[in-house]
């Protein structure tokens, strides 16, 4: 995305986005796991506390929690560490919060936040292990695919980063 999107819609009733100044690694991991386990998100789970804390407390990293009626239901992480750019590192909702328009609002809201900084590019990496609704949502929001890569990693259910019963819709190799 090379230009700011239009204004974000109003948040759904009872839903809010708040910045975590410096989330504790274990609290962050707990929400990351709730959001990402259905899609085998594991990258933050395998970092030790010191490495994760270094990322989360970096001045170029912004972490946001999505709440509904005070309960955490999602997260967003923006990475401004590359000058002039922002990467949407993570964005997601817990399974029970999907399908009601919160994700569309969240994506628009974080895009607006990203463009408050002096950037000329806002980008996201997604993968086949993400929700099948992710790529269409990113395209609707104004992101344009620029390349495709193949990444291979050990299955986090085998390594123990996630429970063996996580993401049953994804074949275990």
Predicted regions and their residues:
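Terminal substrate-recognition subdomain of acyl/acetyltransferases
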Residues: 1-14, 144-173
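Short amphipathic alpha-helix that is part of the acyltransferase structural core
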Residues: 11-44, 164, 171-172
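A conserved beta-strand-loop-helix scaffold within acyl/acetyltransferase catalytic domains
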Residues: 43-50, 56-95
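Short acidic/polar active-site loop segments enriched in Thr and Asp
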Residues: 62, 120, 144
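Conserved glycine-rich acetyl-CoA-binding loop
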Residues: 94-108, 117, 129-133, 140
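Conserved beta-strand-loop-alpha-helix junction that forms the acyl-donor binding cleft
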Residues: 98, 124-134, 151-157
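Conserved GNAT acetyl-CoA-binding A-motif
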Residues: 114-126
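Conserved acetyl-CoA-binding loop of GNAT-fold acetyltransferases
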Residues: 115, 137-148
